[in-house]
Amino acid sequence: MKGEFLTARDIQKILGVKQAKSYDIIRTLNAQMKEEGYMVIQGKVSRAKFEECYCYKGPKSQTG
């Protein structure tokens, strides 16, 4: 999961959703990006767009 793009499997692991839901998320985010004028890759979504929309920043530290 270190690349610029996330797959349905990556989204399943991050959000704990089923495969169908993860593909729905990808379709929704890619549609938004198309409206903004970006080129998209079917079946993958920009990690930056996903993090922007889902406020996901990875595991939080247990210290502090």
Curated annotation (Swiss-Prot):
Keywords: DNA integration, DNA recombination, DNA-binding
GO MF annotations in UniProt: DNA binding
Keyword field contains Amino-acid biosynthesis: no
GO biological process: DNA integration; DNA recombination
Induction: Constitutively expressed at very low levels. Induced in response to overproduction of RapI or treatment with DNA-damaging agent mitomycin C (MMC).
Function: Required for the excision of the integrative and conjugative element ICEBs1. Excision of ICEBs1 requires two sites, attL and attR, at the left and right ends of the integrated ICEBs1.
Protein name per the record: ICEBs1 excisionase
Protein's organism: Bacillus subtilis (strain 168)
Organismal lineage: Bacteria, Bacillati, Bacillota, Bacilli, Bacillales
